[in-house]
């Protein structure tokens, strides 16, 4: 991809199939990370004067999300586990109105921007009833709430994957769909088995973006540890507030990458190159023990994938688009129950390299 090509162009060494497990620190300064090879499970200490967390968001804690499978909050967890680095605005989650069903692949806002409409189980266009002025062109959070509200009233389309609504772009015509919305046409035909020229597209509000993350100052420096930075969706840089505008994350990526990168260079020029060995050894031993303890649980009755799915359902049910004290407390109680059950996980394998059970 483009990023890999640029790295190769500038001679940046890429270590692929490596997963960060913990940050190395002494309570005041970050010295790198303990990383697990997904090939053979070897733990490697990456020593660094400056460390950047750029692992993306945490959308995979929800059942329905447009995020890639690796966006499970791993970077935020590494920061939180230090005990000194705070996270910020973790409750700030954006839902996109039109995630496809059942794949949750994003149906771009260009569909509605070009004139696409949202229909219910009766193929009735309902958005003008809720938002007379903007209808489908209201902001993402508004459209997502209205769609959810309409489905809760019983107007959703029943399916094995849960209720959904319809996105209709048929009236835009074949030429427009296959040229201006070519990506949507390809996604629908290849992944949904739907021809959007003649058929309706099943959609529902889907978790899309995380405004929260590792709390940083304006220069991307994480609070709590010197030498630790965060950027992009992994960070709480406070650029978006609690509701990102469409397209702004791309702008943030470009701007923060250049700006925070330059601030890291400034930090490197003024930082010492002497590292203590004790924090490195302690971090590696702790990660090794954690992995060994998990793998040794071969006789536990709980399945880690069942627990993950249950967590995702809780987040969708109680910490979704609509939030209130009752549902939030119910969600907390149910998550605490899962936490107790997680103490009795039983793994099927003992591989320390690539295994979804450890990831």
Language model regions located:
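Short beta-strand to alpha-helix junction loop
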Residues: 1-5, 15, 65-73, 100-102, ...
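A conserved beta-strand/loop element that lines the FAD pocket in flavoprotein oxidoreductases
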Residues: 8-20
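General beta-strand structural signal in soluble alpha/beta enzymes
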Residues: 14-17, 45-47, 53-54, 87-92, ...
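A short, glycine/Asx- and small/polar-enriched loop/turn
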Residues: 25-31
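Core beta-strand elements of the Rossmann-like FAD/NAD(P) dinucleotide-binding domain
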Residues: 40-50, 223-225
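Glycine-rich loop(s) and the adjacent beta-strand/alpha-helix scaffold that form part
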Residues: 50-105, 137, 152, 159, ...
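An anion/pyrophosphate-binding glycine-rich loop and adjacent beta-alpha core
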Residues: 78, 85-195, 199, 263-270, ...
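Glycine- and aromatic-enriched mobile tails/lids
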Residues: 119-128, 132-137, 156, 209-211, ...
């Amino acid at each position: 991809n483009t990023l890999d090509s640029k790295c190769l162009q500038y001679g940046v060494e890429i270590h692929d199939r490596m997963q960060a497990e913990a940050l190395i620190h002494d309570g005041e300064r970050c010295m790198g990370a303990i990383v697990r090879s997904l090939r053979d499970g070897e733990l490697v200490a990456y020593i660094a004067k400056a460390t950047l967390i750029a692992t993306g968001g945490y959308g995979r804690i929800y059942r329905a999300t447009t995020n890639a499978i690796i966006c499970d909050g791993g970077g935020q967890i590494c920061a939180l586990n230090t005990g000194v680095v705070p996270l910020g605005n973790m409750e700030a989650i954006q839902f996109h109105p039109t995630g496809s069903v059942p794949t949750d692949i994003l149906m771009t806002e260009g569909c509605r921007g070009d004139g696409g409409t949202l229909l219910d189980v009766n193929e009735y266009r309902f958005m003008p009833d809720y938002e007379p002025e903007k209808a489908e062109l209201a902001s993402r959070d508004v459209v997502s709430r209205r769609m959810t509200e309409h489905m809760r009233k019983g107007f959703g389309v029943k399916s094995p994957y849960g209720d959904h609504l319809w996105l209709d772009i048929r009236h835009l015509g074949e030429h427009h769909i296959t040229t201006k919305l070519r990506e949507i046409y390809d996604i629908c035909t290849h992944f949904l088995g739907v021809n959007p020229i003649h058929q309706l597209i099943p959609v529902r509000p889907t978790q899309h973006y995380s405004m929260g993350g590792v709390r940083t100052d304006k220069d991307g420096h994480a609070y709590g540890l010197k030498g630790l930075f965060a950027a992009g969706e992994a960070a709480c840089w406070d650029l978006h507030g609690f509701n990102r505008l469409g397209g702004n994350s791309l702008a943030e990526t470009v701007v923060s990458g250049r700006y925070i990168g330059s601030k890291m260079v400034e930090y490197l020029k003024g930082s010492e190159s002497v590292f203590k060995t004790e924090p490195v050894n302690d971090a590696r031993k702790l990660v090794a023990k954690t992995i060994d303890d998990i793998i040794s649980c071969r006789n536990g009755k709980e399945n880690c994938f069942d627990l993950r799915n249950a967590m995702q359902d809780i987040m969708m049910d109680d910490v979704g688009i609509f939030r209130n004290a009752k549902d939030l407390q119910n969600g907390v109680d149910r998550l605490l129950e899962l936490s107790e059950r997680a103490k009795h996980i039983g793994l099927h394998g003992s591989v320390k390299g690539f295994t979804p059970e450890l990831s």
